């Protein structure tokens, strides 16, 4: 893991290169995704069967998982896993319940009622990865906010495996309250949810993480359906001063590096000795990490330790990165919170590691990546509702403001707009 001592501009330039390397997308992949979407849109279930056999090596006659299979899943998982899942659900629900908003009714002016109605989406699709690892936690994080929002129908898709879907995924789906589950994955699953097939219902919104093909497919169908965000590779930035614990920091960097080779892990510190210790500790921990091959490739390609002269400079650099995950391993992390402008989720102190947020604390782990934390937010209840404004004026209230409306409409050359107001009061002249 390279240690870099640079001025702010040079450091930022190198970080941008790291991020660009992590987000390189080959044109051939984009073309392949578009072709898959076109094929599924036209061929529907037949196309899904073709791609499921091609990419997953499984022949599927029926994509839907039976209620019996879902309910039996709990019999094949550990009790300790179910207990952990229930604890996570409790925390996710208690946190996201506080995000719920109510419709607005404004009756302050005589004869005028204005307001905003908040309504849940009718149905959503949740993509749950099933590639190099299984992610039951993603089920809870994507489904529970939708349930709290009042979404009527939640459809889940996840790639098939030889031998069936991981029962841990099914147990999480059952606990979270998923309505229908289908064994399809990849770009073809996103296309099926966006356009519908004979078996798969069309949804209004698609959420959930996935590989590059899934992310590009979501981008392609945006506008046909809504999506949560375009998720890039996982990333973490650790800001540390001399009080930082090298073992903890290295472990947290590797917790993101093990996701995939394109993940980014960066430490920004004010202390050279700590930087050297973190570098050694990363190598030491890689030796015993089960997913060390993936993590090592990630660290070698997209990992770095930056030395900066001050904590202020470290936070400034972090804000420019706008990371998905930001950890503050500093003396007074809460005092630094006001200086953090751009981050998906912030972890304060040595005992608030990123995996705590991934699994149990309650805030959502579906976060903006690739610098989009500058303008995107974590997944929330808000993502599963839509808002409609309403207006009610009495005759007298409209009459009192008609001249303003007519003036503005005429200035814009929209005379029918003006006429629609004037015609209501012509008989009085």
Swiss-Prot record:
Q: In which pathway does it act?
A: Amino-acid biosynthesis; L-histidine biosynthesis; L-histidine from 5-phospho-alpha-D-ribose 1-diphosphate: step 9/9
Q: Where does Zn(2+) bind?
A: 256, 259, 358, 417
Entry GO MF terms: histidinol dehydrogenase activity; NAD binding; zinc ion binding
GO annotation, cellular component aspect: cytoplasm; cytosol
What top-tier enzyme class does this entry carry?
oxidoreductase
Q: Does the keyword NAD apply?
A: yes
Return the EC number: 1.1.1.23
**UniProt: NAD(+) binding residues:** 127, 188, 211
Q: Does the keyword Signal apply?
A: no
Report any one BP term from Gene Ontology. L-histidine biosynthetic process
In terms of Pfam families, this protein maps to: Histidinol_dh
Q: Which residues bind substrate?
A: 234, 256, 259, 325, 358, 412, 417
Q: How is the cofactor bound?
A: Binds 1 zinc ion per subunit.
Which key words are in the record? Answer: Amino-acid biosynthesis, Histidine biosynthesis, Metal-binding, NAD, Oxidoreductase, Zinc
The residues annotated as the active site are: 324 (proton acceptor), 325 (proton acceptor)
Which NCBIfam families does this chain map to?
Answer: hisD
What is the role of the protein in this entry?
Catalyzes the sequential NAD-dependent oxidations of L-histidinol to L-histidinaldehyde and then to L-histidine.
What family is it from? Answer: Belongs to the histidinol dehydrogenase family.
Q: What is this protein called?
A: Histidinol dehydrogenase
User: Which organism is this protein's natural source?
Assistant: Bacillus cereus (strain ATCC 14579 / DSM 31 / CCUG 7414 / JCM 2152 / NBRC 15305 / NCIMB 9373 / NCTC 2599 / NRRL B-3711)
- Organism classification, top ranks? Bacteria, Bacillati, Bacillota, Bacilli, Bacillales
The gene it comes from is hisD
């Amino acid at each position: 893991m390279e240690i870099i001592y640079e001025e702010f501009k040079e450091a930022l330039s190198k970080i941008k290169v790291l991020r660009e390397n992590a987000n390189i997308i080959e044109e051939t992949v984009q073309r392949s995704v578009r072709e898959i979407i076109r094929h599924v849109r036209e061929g529907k279930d037949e196309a899904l069967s073709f791609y499921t056999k091609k990419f997953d090596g499984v022949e599927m006659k029926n994509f839907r998982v039976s209620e019996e299979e879902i309910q039996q899943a709990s019999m094949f998982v550990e009790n300790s896993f179910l207990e952990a899942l229930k604890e996570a659900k409790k925390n996710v629900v208690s946190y996201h319940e506080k995000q719920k908003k109510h419709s607005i009714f404004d009756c302050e002016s005589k004869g005028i009622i204005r307001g905003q109605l908040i309504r849940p989406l009718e149905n959503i699709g949740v993509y749950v990865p099933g590639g190099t690892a299984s992610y039951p936690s993603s089920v809870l994080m994507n489904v529970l906010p939708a349930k709290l929002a009042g979404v009527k129908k939640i459809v889940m898709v996840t790639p098939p495996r030889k031998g069936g879907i991981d029962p841990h995924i099914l147990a999480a789906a059952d606990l979270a309250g998923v309505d229908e589950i289908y064994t399809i994955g990849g770009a073809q699953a996103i296309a099926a949810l966006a356009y519908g097939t004979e078996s798969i219902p069309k949804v209004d919104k698609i959420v959930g993480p996935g590989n590059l093909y899934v992310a590009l497919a979501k981008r392609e169908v945006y506008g046909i359906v809504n999506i949560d965000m375009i998720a890039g590779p996982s990333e973490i930035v650790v800001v540390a001063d001399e009080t930082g614990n090298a073992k903890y920091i290295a472990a947290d960097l590797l917790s993101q590096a093990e996701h995939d080779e394109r993940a980014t892990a960066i430490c920004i510190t004010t202390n050279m000795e700590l930087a050297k210790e973190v570098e050694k500790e990363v190598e030491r921990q890689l030796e015993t990490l089960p997913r060390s091959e993936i993590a090592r490739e990630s660290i070698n390609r997209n990992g770095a330790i930056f030395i900066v002269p001050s904590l202020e400079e470290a936070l400034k650099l972090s804000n420019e990165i706008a990371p998905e995950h930001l950890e503050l391993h500093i003396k007074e992390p809460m005092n630094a919170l006001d200086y953090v402008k751009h981050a998906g989720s912030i972890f304060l102190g040595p005992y608030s590691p990123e995996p705590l947020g991934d699994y149990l604390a309650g805030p959502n782990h579906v976060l903006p990546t690739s610098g989009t934390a500058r303008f995107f937010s974590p997944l929330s209840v808000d993502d599963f509702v839509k808002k409609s404004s309403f207006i009610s004026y009495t005759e007298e209230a409209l009459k009192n403001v008609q001249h303003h409306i007519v003036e503005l409409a005429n200035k814009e050359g929209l005379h029918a707009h003006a006429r629609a107001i004037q015609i209501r009061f012509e008989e009085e002249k």
